[in-house]
Amino acid sequence: VDEFDHFIDNNNLSEIAYSDKSYEEIKEAFIQAELTPCLKEKLRNYLEVMKKPLAVRSSGLFEDSLSQPFAGVYSTYLIPNNDADMVRRALELEKAIKLVFSSIFTEGSRAYFRAIGSMIEEEKMAVIIQEVVGNEYDGKYYPNISGVAQSYNFYPFSYIKPEDGFAVLALGLGAYVVGGEKTYRFCPRYPRLHLASIQDMMRASQQYFYAIDLKNKAYNLEHDGEDAAIKAYDLKTIEEDGNLTHCASVYDFMNDNITYDFNVMGARIVNFPNILQYDYIPLASTLDTLLDIFSQA
C-alpha cells in the first residue's frame, strides 16, 4: 500500500479524493496523475517477460476484514497486454492500476462505507497483477472452465449435507460466474447426483461465454469500465474452438434424453459430464478436498 500513499501524496489527490466530487471527476484526476518512476520501471521490466493477458485486481485493507464483506466493492480490470508497442502496453497497465486505486471512491464504494459505519480515509489500496489463466483461440482468450465453490450449502437436498458444500461452473472467464448468469451447480462430494431434470437443465444451461477480445485495439478502460476488453460469444464459437467436448451434453429430442454424441442434432447443455460424471480431470475430488481443508482453517 506504500505506492498508493505515494500516489495520493505526490499528486496532491487527497483534496479531490476525499471530497464530495463525483467519481468521474476523481477518476479523471487519478488517470492524469503519475505513478512513481520506480514503479514504472518495475512494470516495464515485468512486461518484458509477461506477454499474456493480465488481471489488475484490488487488494484493499478492508478486503481482509473479518466483520464486513468487501467482495465486489472495488474494480478488477482485464487487459489483453498484446500490443506490439511496449510503451502502449505499459501505459495501459498503468491506467488499469490508477483505475483500481480510484475505485475506492466510486459512488457505490462510498455508499458502502457509510452503510457499515467505516471511514473511507482509513482504506489503503494495494494492487495485484496476475496472468489470466487461459489460452488463445482465434483472437479470443479464455479458460475452458471457471467457477466458485463454498464450503457450506444453505440449500441441500437429497442426502447432501450442508457441510458438503457446493460449486458452480461455467465456460470462459469467471466474470460470467460472479455476474449471476446461468451456471452449472453441483456438490463436489457427490458430483454424479443430478440436481435438476432434463427440462430444468436446458432452461438453466449456459448460452454464451465471456472471453478477452484480443483483436479489439480500440477498447477504453476509462470509458467502458471493467468489461472494456471482454466480449460475449455464443456456444457455437466455443464448440468450433474444440472446447465443448468434455463440458457439455446434447439433448436428443427424438428420444427425449441426453447423449454425449455431438453428431446428434440438438441443444447443447453445459453440464460438464466427462469431468463430473467420468473424472476426465479430478475436479470434483480436488474441490472436495480443498473445501474440507478451508473449512477447518
Q: What does each of the following model-derived ranges do?
A:
Residues 33-297:
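Conserved mixed alpha/beta core segments that line enzyme active sites in large multi-domain catalysts
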Residues 1-43, 112, 120-124:
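A structural-propensity feature for long, helix-poor, extended segments
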